[in-house]
Design a protein with these regions (language model features):
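Short, charged cytosolic
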Residues: 2-29
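Acidic, low-complexity intrinsically disordered regions
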Residues: 34, 59-62, 81, 97, ...
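Compositionally biased, intrinsically disordered low-complexity segments enriched
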Residues: 11-14, 30, 121, 398, ...
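Membrane-embedded hydrophobic alpha-helical segments
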Residues: 44-134, 138
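Coil-to-alpha-helix initiation sites in intrinsically disordered, low-complexity, charged segments
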Residues: 37-38, 109, 186
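N-terminal leader/targeting and pre-domain segments
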Residues: 129, 138-145, 150-163, 168-205, ...
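Juxtamembrane interface helix immediately N-terminal to a transmembrane segment
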Residues: 25-55
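Single-register position within the heptad repeat of long, parallel alpha-helical coiled-coil rods
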Residues: 14, 30-36, 75, 96
């Protein structure tokens, strides 16, 4: 296994999504026993009683009245008939009451069955959700383990799995938005942790990017070169997948119309202190926190877009830097950044504040075609109790390599002055200084020969 993978395995964040699918108490459907009314409890007795009693009254009462009161035979028959009608009506009412009570019981039973079926369906749904979430967490754990595998294909598979899991959490309609974001953020943190993990072969980036093996190379050049290129692809894939899910920029005739947030736009990302040894060109970078990052070989951001703040504070660029045709939509900071070689900002667009205070430039700087639409870039900044933080430019460079005069019509001008050191005169941004690279003091960790500020 590559040492870089071991470093990631030791240093990765032990982040496991929390289990949100907590058991929900399930109420049992126990229909309340339907209490029988008195006429139902004694229905048979009442039916027989009214039948026999009504029949007896219908026979005896007319006969007694005929005998005692001497009513006519026709009246007696009419009375008997009415008594039978009344008896039949009472029996019919009892029957209707009994039928109604039975129907009510059937309805209650049906309602209870429906409610039980609904609760069973809800329980099955909860069980399914718990199963889905558990399966996701199992895939998450396996994918994190894959990131430490010595085979690049396995690591790449782990990255695609983690990216897919983030999308699944975000699309999970069973969770509230805050929980979806929380679950996705855990996985994004792991992807960022992988980007920040050490990779020892990055120290040999310039050598391994060459097709010619040095005669004094320590190790197996072909093996190291293959591992280096594989890891370049693996780590760049993370940025590519994030870029696909970042904000979309709508243009009309080179005019910004709208920025449409992407599905991952609200996630926090952290690439600080990361070793970067692969190109980051043609990407949309939502939140570019590269503070204290170290860029090995050429730092290539050609045609990339930064939608939010771009933070390169204290970043170290060990080789050439290309921010050509890059668009910065928000504040950009290169405070105390160290540019060891060429720094090109050709056709770069800065639409918000840009700060180069305290930055160190060792070779060519080209800002001649950069566009500043919000404010002029800051190269010297006064800080209370500290003094003035000034950008520094090497006095051993060719004065013609520092290009700040801009011919673009729609840009704010970089105000420049002159500074002298080592009997050489340079045109630099106001307030900045020249330094002698040979004057480095290891004890003070500082250059001791500086020019007066450009004015």
């Amino acid at each position: 296994m590559l040492e870089g993978k071991r470093s990631y395995q030791r240093g990765q964040e032990t982040l496991v999504p929390s289990n949100n699918a907590s058991p929900i108490p399930e109420s049992q459907v126990i229909p309340k026993a339907q209490e029988k009314p008195w006429y139902i409890q004694h229905f048979i007795k009442l039916l027989i009683g009214f039948g026999l009693g009504g029949g007896a009254v219908a026979i005896l009462l007319p006969w007694m009245l005929w005998m005692l009161c001497d009513i006519s035979s026709g009246s007696s028959d009419q009375l008997r008939l009415h008594l039978l009608y009344i008896t039949g009506g009472i029996i019919a009412v009892l029957t209707l009451l009994q039928t109604n009570w039975k129907n009510q019981g059937d309805r209650l039973k049906i309602d209870a069955d429906i409610k039980k079926n609904e609760q069973d369906a809800e329980k099955n749904e909860r069980d399914h959700i718990r199963q889905v979430h558990a399966e996701r967490r199992s895939r998450y754990t396996k994918a994190v383990e894959q990131l430490a595998d010595e085979k690049a294909a396995v690591r790449l598979g782990g990255i695609y799995t983690l990216v897919g899991l983030v999308d699944e959490w975000l699309a999970d309609g069973t969770l509230i938005p805050e929980e979806r974001q929380k679950e996705g953020q855990v996985i994004v943190n792991n992807l960022c942790s992988y980007i920040r993990s050490p990779f020892p072969l990055a120290l040999k980036a310039e050598v391994l990017e060459s097709d010619i093996e040095p005669t004094d190379y320590e190790g197996t050049f072909s093996k190291d070169q293959a591992a280096f290129r594989e890891e370049q692809d693996v780590r760049r894939t993370i940025f590519v997948e994030m870029s696909k899910r970042s904000s979309d920029v709508i243009w009309d005739d080179d005019k910004l119309i709208e920025i449409i947030p992407g599905t991952w736009s609200d996630f926090d990302v952290d690439f600080s202190r990361a070793p970067i040894f692969y190109p980051l060109s043609n990407l949309t970078i939502e939140k570019g926190n590269f503070s204290s990052a170290k860029f090995y070989s050429a730092a290539n951001f050609f045609s990339s877009v930064f939608n939010s703040d771009a933070d390169f504070r204290e970043a170290t660029f060990t080789s050439n830097v290309f921010f050509n045709e890059v668009i910065f939509f928000s504040a950009t900071s290169f405070v105390e950044a160290n540019f060891a070689r060429t720094a090109d900002f050709i056709a770069t667009s800065f639409t918000d504040n840009t700060n180069f205070s305290g930055a160190t430039f060792s070779s060519r700087v080209n800002l001649s075609e950069a566009e500043f639409t919000q404010s002029t870039p800051i190269f010297a900044m006064s800080i209370s109790n500290i003094g003035v933080w000034r950008a520094r430019f090497s006095a051993q460079a060719d004065p013609k390599d520092y290009m700040f005069e801009n011919s673009l019509k729609h840009t704010l001008e970089i105000r420049c002055g002159t500074a002298e050191l080592l009997n050489r005169t340079f045109i630099l941004p106001l307030g900045t200084v020249l330094y002698d690279p040979d004057s480095w003091d290891e004890r003070q960790k500082e250059y001791t020969r500086l020019s007066e500020p450009a004015q």
